Every structure is written in structure tokens, then in C-alpha cells.
Design a protein with these regions (language model features):
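Active-site catalytic microenvironments for nucleophilic, acid-base chemistry
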Residues: 14-18, 78, 213, 217-221
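Active-site substrate-recognition segment that forms the wall
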Residues: 30-32, 38-39, 58-189
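Helical element adjacent to the flavin cofactor pocket in flavoenzyme catalytic cores
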Residues: 1-35, 39-49
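Short acidic, glycine-rich loop/turn motifs
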Residues: 43-55, 97-99
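Short, conserved active-site loop motifs that form the nucleotide-linked donor/cofactor pocket
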Residues: 19-21, 124, 193
Length: 237
């Protein structure tokens, strides 16, 4: 069990040291494959961008990787790529440790209820549950109650549930899951458009491996794993 947010922050810092540039608060409003000459993107800066909102500007790339989760459905529909992705909603909560002796020392999986409980430094995180849902919405009270109940059953009194607002963090996240349960990793039928989508609940677990395999394919190298079962071509993409 690891802290995926901390990993992402450290990964961003490392990639920036290697020359990677990030464009936050920027909308990709159009994708235009140019056979033999790369991919043109139309970008729009939002009001939250440090430079303020602006009119559209263009950018050209040799190739692009679409890894935008459910947002990829709307991005690629104008190009005729109909992604077979569905939204699966998961919940988690985290709270500060009250009594270290009562808190978990390693990850625990409640297989009956599909809930994991893990120690992350001085906090305990409880996550689990999967249900079909929408991309937006408030956390489900029933789903959160199942997490609280599992925590109380396994580690009663281990965390501080009172205190100031925000001391207990409740979270709702949406995972993009392909209809056949397999991710979409590889080249699409459009030149220069590559996909890395639909990992579902395994996203955090396979993120690095999927990225490495895709980078190998884009670089003309044979990946260490066979991506045939994850090819977008199986879905006509």
C-alpha cells in the first residue's frame, strides 16, 4: 500500500527536472491528426491559468497520448473514436491516528466487503466499494458508512473521528473502466493518436508498467509484456 498522491507529486518533480513541461488549467478543445506530419492540438487557457484566460492557440506534436479517463470520451468522439468506457465510482476516507497501538501496521483487505484499510504515516485510509455512477456528484453516504463500519470492526478507536472540520477526509473518485474489463493501451487507428485508458480499479497498480510498455511501443521497441489483449484495435479504435 502506498500514497499515490505523494507518488504523483514526486513524479512530477522528477519529470520536470528531466525537461517535461506541464500545462495546467488548459483545455484541449480540438485534436487534429495530420497524416505524416504529427498531431495538431487547439489549446484554451482557463481563467484559473496563471496567465489568465486567453483565446485558442495551436500546438503541434509528433504524437499524443490520451490518458484523460472518462474525459477522453468527449475528446475523441469528434474523431469517430467511440470509447467503450463506463464510470465506476469508489470511495475512501482518511483520518489521523488516535492510538498507534490500535491502528494497523500494514494493509488489511476485507475481502467480504471489498474494503482495504492501510496505515499512511500518521493517518489511516479506508477505501473500497465499486458501483456504476456518474463522473460528478457528492460522496454516497451509504458507501461512506460502510467504510466507517469496516474501520470500527477491524480497528475500533484507532483514529480521531472528531475534531475540527477537515480532520476526516472523505473522497469520491471515478474510475474509467472498459466494457470488457481490459484497458486500452496502444496506438489507435488514427495516426499519431495513442491511448492509455480504462484501467479501472487497477489504475494505480499498473500505472508505471502501462506507461513503460506504451513508451516502448511508441519508441519502436518491443515491450516486456504482450499488449495484444489491451490493444485499442480490438474495439475498432
Amino acid at each position: 500500500m502506498a500514497n499515490c498522491r505523494k507518488f504523483a507529486v514526486l513524479l512530477r518533480a522528477q519529470t520536470q527536472r528531466l525537461g517535461c513541461q506541464f500545462e495546467f488549467n488548459t483545455i484541449v478543445s480540438r485534436i487534429e491528426p495530420q497524416p505524416g506530419s504529427g498531431v495538431n492540438l487547439t489549446l484554451t487557457l482557463t481563467a484559473s491559468h496563471p496567465g489568465g484566460a486567453s483565446s485558442d492557440r495551436g500546438a503541434r506534436f509528433d504524437a499524443v497520448v490520451i490518458c484523460a479517463g472518462l474525459a477522453a470520451v468527449g475528446m475523441l468522439a469528434p474523431l469517430g473514436l467511440r470509447l467503450p468506457l463506463q464510470a465506476v465510482v469508489g470511495h475512501s476516507l482518511s483520518a489521523a491516528v488516535r492510538e498507534p497501538m490500535d491502528a494497523p501496521q500494514s494493509a488489511v483487505l476485507d475481502a467480504r466487503h471489498g474494503i482495504s484499510i492501510a496505515r499512511l504515516g500518521q493517518r489511516v485510509r479506508v477505501a473500497g466499494g465499486a458501483e456504476w455512477g456518474r463522473e460528478s456528484g457528492a460522496p454516497s453516504k451509504a458507501a461512506l458508512q460502510r467504510l466507517y463500519s469496516a474501520l470500527a470492526d477491524w480497528f475500533p478507536g484507532a483514529v480521531r473521528l472528531g475534531g475540527p472540520a477537515g480532520s476526516v477526509q472523505e473522497w469520491r473518485g471515478v474510475q474509467a473502466t472498459a466494457s470488457d474489463g481490459m484497458p486500452l493501451i496502444g496506438a489507435s487507428r488514427l495516426p499519431g493518436i495513442w491511448l492509455n485508458l480504462g484501467h479501472g480499479q487497477a489504475g494505480w497498480s499498473v500505472a508505471c508498467g502501462a506507461a513503460r510498455a506504451l513508451a516502448d511501443r511508441m519508441g519502436g521497441r518491443a515491450p516486456d509484456i504482450d499488449l495484444a489483449a489491451s490493444s485499442p484495435q480490438r474495439c475498432g479504435l
